[in-house]
Amino acid sequence: LYSLNEGKINNFDFKHKLYLEKLKNEEFSSRYCGCLVADFHNILMNGGIFMYPFDVYKDKSKLRLLYEAKPLAKIIEKTGGLMTDGIIDINKKKLEKIHETTPLYFGSKKNMLDFNDFSNNYELNKDDYKNYTSKIYGC
């Protein structure tokens, strides 16, 4: 199970597009309703991964660190899952501004470790991007 707004696929960086395609090839099903708490509950109950990546066109994220990410990070930590901003654990992330926003990824430990492994070990080179055509999105 994965949860993310596929309507914004063009706003994701290339690595996220590839990871999404990987999930689809592994026959993960998509469940996204656009309500963070409902999506959070769905991931807790059924497993999987939630992704709200950085928006490359708006040059920012949407979800607020203090009001949305940190409270949910405490809950998911207690249930054995993981929540990061794509790099560091949300619980360890220092708040710099009261309305600071953050990319957000959370889910079962297994799915999050798979995502982190993919993110940390994939090196994009120009030929990958130039010669890449998505089988799913055609771009």
For the regions a language model picked out, list residue spans one by one.
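IMPase-like, lithium-sensitive Mg2+-dependent phosphomonoesterase catalytic core
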Residues: 1-139
